[in-house]
Amino acid sequence: MATLFLTILLATVLFLILRIFSHRRNRSHNNRLPPGPNPWPIIGNLPHMGTKPHRTLSAMVTTYGPILHLRLGFVDVVVAASKSVAEQFLKIHDANFASRPPNSGAKHMAYNYQDLVFAPYGHRWRLLRKISSVHLFSAKALEDFKHVRQEEVGTLTRELVRVGTKPVNLGQLVNMCVVNALGREMIGRRLFGADADHKADEFRSMVTEMMALAGVFNIGDFVPSLDWLDLQGVAGKMKRLHKRFDAFLSSILKEHEMNGQDQKHTDMLSTLISLKGTDLDGDGGSLTDTEIKALLLNMFTAGTDTSASTVDWAIAELIRHPDIMVKAQEELDIVVGRDRPVNESDIAQLPYLQAVIKENFRLHPPTPLSLPHIASESCEINGYHIPKGSTLLTNIWAIARDPDQWSDPLAFKPERFLPGGEKSGVDVKGSDFELIPFGAGRRICAGLSLGLRTIQFLTATLVQGFDWELAGGVTPEKLNMEESYGLTLQRAVPLVVHPKPRLAPNVYGLGSG
């Protein structure tokens, strides 16, 4: 124990010495750093973050303004908390902030930065991004898997009809639907249900463990001199999980390769396998097995909880605002009718539903703080010096509630996005910086198109197909809307409801009615 304490003490002293020299070398810039709360010795501003850092950082804007400087351990962190500041970082200086800072999760679980989400900005990242855009998330690719999403959403609606008067945890059922759809699109397997095999069970449990580990604060990421000690055992758990995950993905990859032409382009993995050995960039660049596995890992971890939690929040908001629910249902009844279920191609003709979903993204972004970026070089933003190596966080949640951008920012008002509304031309695809739930710039979410389709289609289906009543006699105005902070912004209390079918049984695929 004494040896461990001495090691920590020596490592800390060494870092303090290095920081003193760094301070002297850069002292001409220090008075130009963005403002922020005074850091504590060693741990910096970590104690200031609290359990809901997006809210804590938003509150700091009142005191320090829309660009903040923090010290988390020994890491310089800059927070963008307004539309104009975010645009400076992610548009004007986008190239300088196109890489990610080092972190234990990417190192130990995401194939040592060989994935798309955490890969350094450069040639290999551009190649992976091109593969994703052209082969996985293009309009054609999304259309090819449209039937999968329709089938899984149909399964969900039939289950909701069959529950009768029993209450259901809506978020849980929606999550199962999204996981099954993505599992079939990715690897040709459902992960929930009677036809899910033992490999699917294993995969699902590993994803759950990975999401939990990725949300753990690892002190080694912020005090690098302590990283090798793995004081919390986080790195060890990540390494063991990665070993299991890699074995699973390797077996699935081998199975697909053995099936050869029989499985060509039947799922995303077979598409990726077909690209192996192909010159993808005109310079001999091809896709490796490791990169294929890393891409699968990215798609599954990024695409499940985010979509499911967003739909869960949307239905909760509509239950709280029955007048808005009625308007959305009336639009669906007029455009689609009650004789068939809504499908993805109908969404373009449902402007009010689209406005509801935009407003839901505004108040409940799936990731309230962006994934971190790193400054490749020092630069100046709004007159402040941003040191090389600084970590950038964009407070997506705070920007979307900024009273300088939004009238009545805490109210749920889809009309603001309709023609004549204050934000009628605003979209969620990264060009309007007051609303960037998928991020912006070069590192915008690669799966934006699939995620948006999934969320729109699921929400439309649940609105068209059912009226909703809260369980336990809870009234809409008493519905708990507290959030639980993590990798995604989940509801703190599950949304437990009674679904009441509003269409004929045959529309749900349950026979003539």
From Swiss-Prot:
The keyword Metal-binding applies. GO terms for biological process: flavonoid biosynthetic process; response to auxin. Signal peptide: none annotated. One of its GO terms (molecular function) is flavonoid 3'-monooxygenase activity. Heme binds at residue 445. Induction: By UV light treatment. One of its GO terms (cellular component) is endoplasmic reticulum membrane. InterPro entries: Cyt_P450 (IPR001128), Cyt_P450_CS (IPR017972), Cyt_P450_E_grp-I (IPR002401), Cyt_P450_sf (IPR036396). High expression in siliques and to a lower extent in stems, flowers and senescing leaves. It is a single-pass type III membrane protein. PROSITE patterns: CYTOCHROME_P450. It holds the Pfam family p450. The keyword Nucleus does not apply. Its EC number is 1.14.14.82. The chain crosses the membrane at residues 1-21. It catalyses: a 3'-unsubstituted flavone + reduced [NADPH--hemoprotein reductase] + O2 = a 3'-hydroxyflavone + oxidized [NADPH--hemoprotein reductase] + H2O + H(+). Its cofactor is heme. Belongs to the cytochrome P450 family. May act as a membrane anchor for localization of other, soluble, flavonoid enzymes to the endoplasmic reticulum. Catalyzes the 3'-hydroxylation of the flavonoid B-ring to the 3',4'-hydroxylated state. Convert naringenin to eriodictyol and dihydrokaempferol to dihydroquercetin. This is Flavonoid 3'-monooxygenase.
